[in-house]
């Protein structure tokens, strides 16, 4: 949520900032702005716009109207104060002696504002960010040095933040600082950069530094220096980003989401290949050893959104294959219920970005309780990756569309890998069964591709029901977890009211919502639960529902009940989610397209939720 870009170098800054901000649109925003310093005059120009980034581009003539080689930019997601030009970043002091952009939430903003009001400061916006810039200015006037001003402000602020800061009295410099909000520092031959995420600067450099909590960076065109909160200089290791810049482009597809749906065979294959060597699972890269798994008595999977649905699948798979009890928690609820974490357990944090605020908070609670943490993340060097005891990277590559597809699919692979490895180490399955499961898992990329090849039928069906007012998804066991993700895909990008229910719960109230014309999607891929789910599907059809059935090849008698049937390839039932989710992703996508909506950037949503 929110996006930050900064540049100091030999080129004009404004076009670079606008381009970088365009690469962060997936994070969600309602306004945007840039601040550019003109080296000849020393003046700092600030331009803001409410709405889409193209409005800011038009106001600045694509950046050409604002001259200068040093600047900071921002896309804002409103948290304090309504979406408006006045509340948009960058924010500044009255004389523009300090200019600042911010991602995060300052929890004690009212306390700090009261302090600053007593010191004679006035405020023009409703934002917590304006408090931050004036707090930095307050300490700058006291100390006379940017580093001390920033560090003292950091000590006073409670909450999360990533800052990009310019001082009028210090031309040719940008300062950056962070706590619990993502920020990276980049370097190329022409200058230095800051950004909230890799795609913003990937066209300019692959060489980045990850700035840690309570750390400050000082950037000039030629050099970057890092400091801890005590202003002691520290050393950082440069990291090379391995992503291909083209991977963050649409590549001929109409939307990023469709491209990313079609990239799933590759993403799944890459993730399996990273951990399966010569037919055996190798967790050396994760740091997780056989000894860590051997005495495991319980696993806690903690996540948000689609990653939480992955956790639900993980629960079924791990308990069935490895015979280890699993609890699945929403990260936003986990720490507030005072969880009773047992010894010899493992907390698994699942997050695409590795920066999800609630998941980070859950991770830290687990570590405070002395429970080891396995992070399942897609972004190398992210906060969750750095703070976890063990890290299982997924190899989805950059995922730009707000609605996750390929990251979800690679997270499923992480659950399968963990289940199989734990089962073998604990002696629950023998080598032959382990080999059998791994071999079947390796067929998933081809089976996903086969499912994608049947997308025209889904497109036809989606266009027919694009004007539905309600869509319900039902299933049992793993099929219920699949239904939850299918429903989320439908509601988040098509804006159609959609809910998922455990099919056996229909009689306990939900069936009263069924009436003529309601679309119900019945997911029935589990052999032992097939007849029971069909029975529930008959119940809703008898009350007027139009029924779509989703099952595996061979279960053709579903057509006796369903008005429209979709089939996916057979696989181990533990792995069915990987193929069954594909038609539901496509269905959500094609409904959104039929309605003419912004598929990649749905309203009110952000790709990376970095505030609680």
Language model features with spans:
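Generic C-terminus detector
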Residues: 231, 546, 561, 571-612
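Glycine-rich phosphate-binding loops that contact phosphosugars or nucleotide phosphates
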Residues: 294-436, 440-443, 523-569, 587, ...
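Conserved short alpha-helical segments that host acidic/polar catalytic motifs at enzyme active sites
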Residues: 1-250, 254, 266-297, 336, ...
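Acidic/histidine-rich
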Residues: 157-191, 466-492, 529, 534
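Glycine-rich oxoanion-binding loops at beta->alpha junctions
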Residues: 69, 73-86, 277-290, 314-350, ...
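Active-site phosphate/pyrophosphate-binding segments
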Residues: 264-268, 272-300, 390-519, 592-612
């Amino acid at each position: 949520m929110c996006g930050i870009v900064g540049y100091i170098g030999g080129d004009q800054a404004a076009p670079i900032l606008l381009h970088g901000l365009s690469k962060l649109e997936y994070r969600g925003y309602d306004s945007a702005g840039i601040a550019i310093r003109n080296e000849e005059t020393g003046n700092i120009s600030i331009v803001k716009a409410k709405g889409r980034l193209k409005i800011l581009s038009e106001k600045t003539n694509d950046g050409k109207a604002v001259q200068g080689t040093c600047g900071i930019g921002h896309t804002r997601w409103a948290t304090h104060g309504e979406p408006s030009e006045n509340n948009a970043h960058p924010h500044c002091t009255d004389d523009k002696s300090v200019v600042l952009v911010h991602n995060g939430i300052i929890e004690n903003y009212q306390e700090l504002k009261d302090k600053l009001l007593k010191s004679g400061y006035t405020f023009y916006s409703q934002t917590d960010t304006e408090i931050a810039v004036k707090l930095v200015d307050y300490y700058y006037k006291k100390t006379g040095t940017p580093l001390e001003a920033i560090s003292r402000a950091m000590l006073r602020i409670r909450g999360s933040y990533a800052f990009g800061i310019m001082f009028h009295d210090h031309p040719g410099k940008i300062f950056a600082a962070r706590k619990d909000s993502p920020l990276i520092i980049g370097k190329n031959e022409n200058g230095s950069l800051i950004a909230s995420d890799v795609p913003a600067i990937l066209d300019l450099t692959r060489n980045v530094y990850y700035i840690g909590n309570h750390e400050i960076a000082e950037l000039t065109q030629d050099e970057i220096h890092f400091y801890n909160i005590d202003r002691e200089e520290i050393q950082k290791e440069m990291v090379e980003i391995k992503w291909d810049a083209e991977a963050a482009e649409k590549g001929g597809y109409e939307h990023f989401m469709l491209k990313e749906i079609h990239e799933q065979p590759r993403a799944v294959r890459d993730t399996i290949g990273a951990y399966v060597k010569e037919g055996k699972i190798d967790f050396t890269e994760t740091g997780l050893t056989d000894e860590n798994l051997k005495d495991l008595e319980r696993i806690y999977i903690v996540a948000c959104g689609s990653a939480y649905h992955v956790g639900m699948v993980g629960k079924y798979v791990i308990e069935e294959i490895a015979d280890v009890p699993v609890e699945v928690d929403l990260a936003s609820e986990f720490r507030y219920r005072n969880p009773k974490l047992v010894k010899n357990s493992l907390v698994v944090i699942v997050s695409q970005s590795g920066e999800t605020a609630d998941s980070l908070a859950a991770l830290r609670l687990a570590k405070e309780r002395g429970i080891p943490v396995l992070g399942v993340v897609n972004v190398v060097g992210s906060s969750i990756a750095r703070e976890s005891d063990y890290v299982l990277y997924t190899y989805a590559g950059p995922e730009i569309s707000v609605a996750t597809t390929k990251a979800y699919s690679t997270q499923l692979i992480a659950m399968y890998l963990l289940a199989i490895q734990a089962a073998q180490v604990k002696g629950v399955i023998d080598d032959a069964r382990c080999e059998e499961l791994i071999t079947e898992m390796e067929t998933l990329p081809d089976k996903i591709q086969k499912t994608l090849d049947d997308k025209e039928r889904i497109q036809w069906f989606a266009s027919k029901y694009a004007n539905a007012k309600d869509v319900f998804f039902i299933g049992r066991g793993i099929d219920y977890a699949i239904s939850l993700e299918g429903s989320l895909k439908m509601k988040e990008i098509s804006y159609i009211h959609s809910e998922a229910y455990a099919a056996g719960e229909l009689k306990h109230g939900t069936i009263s919502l069924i009436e003529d014309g309601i679309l119900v999607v019945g997911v029935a891929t589990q052999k032992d639960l097939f007849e029971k789910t069909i029975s529930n599907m008959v119940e809703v059809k008898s009350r007027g529902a139009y029924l779509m059935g989703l099952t595996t090849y061979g279960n053709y008698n579903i057509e006796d009940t369903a008005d429209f049937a979709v089939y996916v390839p057979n696989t181990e039932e533990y792995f069915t989610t990987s193929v069954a989710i594909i038609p539901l992703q496509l269905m959500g996508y094609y409904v959104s397209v039929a309605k003419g909506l912004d598929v990649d950037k749905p309203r009110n949503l952000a790709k990376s939720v970095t505030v609680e």
